[in-house]
Amino acid sequence: MRVTSDEAVVFIVDDDADFRDSLVALLDSVGLQTKTFGSIKELLATNFSDVVSCLVLDVRLPGLSGLDFQAELAKTNNLIPIIFLTGYGDVPMSVKAMKLGAVDFLTKPPRDQDLLDAITVALQRDRTRREAARELAALRSLLQNLTPREREVMGLVAKGLMNKQIAGKLGVSEATVKFHRGRVMEKLGVRSVADLVKMTQRAE
């Protein structure tokens, strides 16, 4: 199946081929793109982090289990949303999965609507996360355009210091502080000190 950057993809990992096929048929019926794998090892052989996506993952898999894989992803800060499927309905296991950020924990075979609802939530979560990451990268790129002195002034403004206080702290005139603050706001495209403070907080 062809996967492009603007398509959301549901990655299905389950060692039961018939069950995988049934999920593909369900998701295809509502226009969702899918890629299927019989094990974590097969999944790792592909690039599954470049598009808006989620994982539908069997808890008990040959080799690395679903929960172990979730823990490994967390260690590498890979935040792809996961929906766990289990034939056992293990409550302690589901609690552990949810604490690590799983979207849902469903008993196999799941109700079609329950699975579709969970996938909708998961894909929106991933889409929102990616948009936030792009915005943060763009903001940090803008901050690179500031001079060291401008970054210093910006940091002090964000801490709530007045121009006079900043001038005293830096050993410069108040007019110089106003100039640097104006340049910072111009470069970052903000119109008020409140917006500047918010932008500083987002970049941290």
Where are these regions (language model features)?
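Acidic, metal-coordinating helix/loop segments flanking the phosphotransfer/catalytic sites
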Residues: 36-54
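Active-site residues of response regulator receiver
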Residues: 58, 86
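C-terminal output helix
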Residues: 90-92, 106, 110-120
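Basic, Lys/Arg-enriched C-terminal extension of HTH/homeodomain DNA-binding domains
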Residues: 185-204
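Short amphipathic alpha-helix used as the core "switch/output" element in two-component signaling
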Residues: 45, 67-79, 96
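Non-catalytic signal-transmission and effector/linker regions of two-component phosphorelay proteins
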Residues: 1-11, 17, 24, 138, ...
